[in-house]
Amino acid sequence: MRETVKLIEVARELPVSRKNLQMLLLLLLCGAAAYIINLADPALEPLFLALVFGIVAGNLQRDEEKKRVVERYVPFLLPIGITLYGVNINIPYLGEFHPEIVAATLISTSLIFLTVFWLSSRLKLSRQMSILLACGSGICGVSAIAIISPLIKPRKEEFSAAIMIITAVGLTGAILYPSIAHYASISPDEFAVLAGATLHQTGIVKISSQLFGVEEEALAIKGIRIAMIALVVLILSIIYSESRFYVPWYIVSFLGVALFSSTYLPGEVVQALRPLATVMFATTLAAICYTVNVGRVQRVGVKPLFASYAGWAVGVAFVLLLLGSGAL
């Protein structure tokens, strides 16, 4: 209740003028454009596109007053965007899967997460950057990074770099997986397991698996990993809370929306709400990245890229080993 009142107070304090409304419209256009492009090419994650649009717009205009205005809108947009994005999280019923597939997916996800986090730590990346890369690699790509970032509070350049890196690794997978499937002689059903258990973004899983006619199977397996974001968010919110056992209200509402939309809302209602949720969250990312300096993003270096690729390679090797041994 207290934080709801606080959000209302933030909304009341937002600067309202013709110029500021034009800025808000620009951010909304960034989010809408990202969503529309994703409809044409699902491999291009709308949150990633919104990030790029926000960075480009901010660095082209170089108006410090506008950046200050945008920064004041972010605390209002972020909790709403995260809450609504819960409709994009489908919590699957694990009884629909073979136990060995569930186990393999959970183990490979954990293996990727731990490998990326360990390597990032060894390479002396910040704890926040390590968590962003680990969650993005192991769970659900850009979405995971965007959802957990308010909890761990990384630097803006780390946030932007993590999204770009995870997108690059995912696109690499989309290019290489057909060749891997050919040389490893795996069946379409086995490819669904490989794609669903190791690829980063949902759109890339969809495109890759369409080539083998196993789109639904691969997306269902990917859904197991996506559902893990609920547990990770809950754990991180407790670890990083300023008060003991405190979970931010927008995290609770995000989890509630995800659970409600997965179990009670009719499928057609969920499908109708997802565009709104995606555009809203994409708009929020455009606002966050509007104030990002490109030069600082470049200074992040190649170490995060190495850690992410290495963790992904370990996950792929593990799943291929299981498939080759006949365990799946």
From Swiss-Prot:
The chain crosses the membrane at residues 21-39, 43-60, 73-95, 101-123, 130-152, 162-184, 191-213, 223-240, 245-267, 271-293, 305-327. It is a multi-pass membrane protein. It is found in: Cell membrane. The keyword Membrane applies. Pfam families: Cons_hypoth698. GO terms for cellular component: plasma membrane. The keyword Flavoprotein does not apply. Its main location: membrane. Keywords: Cell membrane, Membrane, Transmembrane, Transmembrane helix. Belongs to the UPF0324 family. NCBIfam families: YeiH family putative sulfate export transporter. This is UPF0324 membrane protein AF_1621.
